[in-house]
From Swiss-Prot:
Belongs to the peroxiredoxin-like PRXL2 family. PRXL2A subfamily. The keyword Secreted applies. The active site cysteines correspond to the redox-active cysteines of peroxiredoxins. InterPro entries: PXL2A/B/C. One of its GO terms (molecular function) is antioxidant activity. This is Peroxiredoxin-like 2A. It comes from Homo sapiens (Human).
Length: 229
């Protein structure tokens, strides 16, 4: 047992433990930056979206079924992760840059939020050129709600998104729930269906604007004849 008295034995042991810990940390960091641990989104059916209850944000709110948003002319809808998030404000501004083209197509632009805290929606409105509604039951964030917790802060893609939005001049706050991931939908008129469904996979994972515009061009507005069918 003389080797136990050899200082080099303990030094080598500590180096081995340290190397093992570093290797495990490196592997964890590597896996955290892949999609291995990301929850897979469950696609929403049109019938699921149609039945969602939304509320207007007036002093006397009106509750209505979400299908009213797209029944006649289709719609582009942003499910906002958190109005105070500067990444969400960046995406809202990006979508709003399509507003004039969407207007030419006759397709409205909307957003839904999952909570209405103090002036958060009011402060978000300058970034978004469309009406905003409240989805209290968070249905637009389902059918299977997905969360990104603190793992998001060790993902390189998230940090890239942070710097991109920051360099773009966007700022925000930490008010409200921000772990349930959002998304963007392009829904056709009537029973045309969901033409685009983008589910945020990490903080700041923005929808492709060209894809939104291409999907919006596929919308076929309801006519009196089609409404009677």
């Amino acid at each position: 047992m003389s080797f136990l008295q050899d200082p080099s034995f303990f030094t080598m042991g500590m180096w081995s433990i340290g190397a093992g810990a570093l290797g495990a940390a490196a592997l964890a960091l590597l896996l955290a930056n892949t999609d291995v641990f990301l929850s897979k989104p469950q696609k929403a059916a049109l019938e699921y979206l149609e039945d969602i209850d939304l509320k207007t944000l007036e002093k006397e709110p009106r509750t209505f079924k979400a299908k009213e948003l797209w029944e006649k002319n289709g719609a582009v809808i942003m499910a906002v992760r958190r109005p105070g998030c500067f990444l969400c404000r960046e995406e809202a501004a990006d979508l709003s840059s399509l507003k004039s083209m969407l207007d030419q197509l006759g397709v409205p632009l909307y957003a839904v939020v999952k909570e209405h805290i103090r002036t958060e929606v009011k402060d978000f409105q300058p970034y978004f050129k469309g009406e905003i509604f409240l989805d209290e039951k968070k249905k637009f964030y389902g059918p299977q709600r997905r969360k990104m917790m603190f793992m998001g802060f060790i993902r390189l893609g998230v940090w890239y998104n942070f710097f991109r939005a920051w360099n773009g001049g966007f700022s925000g706050n930490l008010e409200g729930e921000g772990f349930i991931l959002g998304g963007v939908f392009v829904v056709g008129s009537g029973k045309q269906g969901i033409l685009l469904e983008h589910r945020e996979k990490e903080f700041g994972d923005k929808v492709n604007l060209l894809s939104v515009l291409e999907a919006a061009k596929m919308i076929k507005p309801q006519t009196l004849a089609s409404e009677k069918k």
